[in-house]
Amino acid sequence: MIKVGNNLIVNTDSKIDIKNCPDGNCIVLTCGLKLNSTVTASSIDEYGFTFCLQRSVYSLSNNIISPQEFNVHYTKKPDDLFPLLSVVTAMLLCDVDPKVFEIIRF
């Protein structure tokens, strides 16, 4: 789980812990491989995956981040994609341009 501003990024498969949102005003962004997750992955192989943002969200600077897909690369396929999905989501919320992920290897 990662908290970015008032956004709480959680694993779709985990129980959401509202203690991290004391005022109850968090926007919950789910990450996982379920079809109803806010963020999911497709085309997973030994080199990377396609990051899929399935609904619009707001960045910390209040810019709209539209639904989109882009490739994320890694040097070794992880056993669990949630950490990568959550870090990439956090970076988007901090206004990192998705084009940056063309040159980053996790």
Regions inferred by a protein language model and the residue ranges of each:
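Adenine nucleotide phosphate-binding catalytic loops in nucleotide-utilizing enzymes
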Residues: 29-106
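Flexible active-site lid/hinge loop adjacent to a nucleotide/diphosphate
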Residues: 1-30
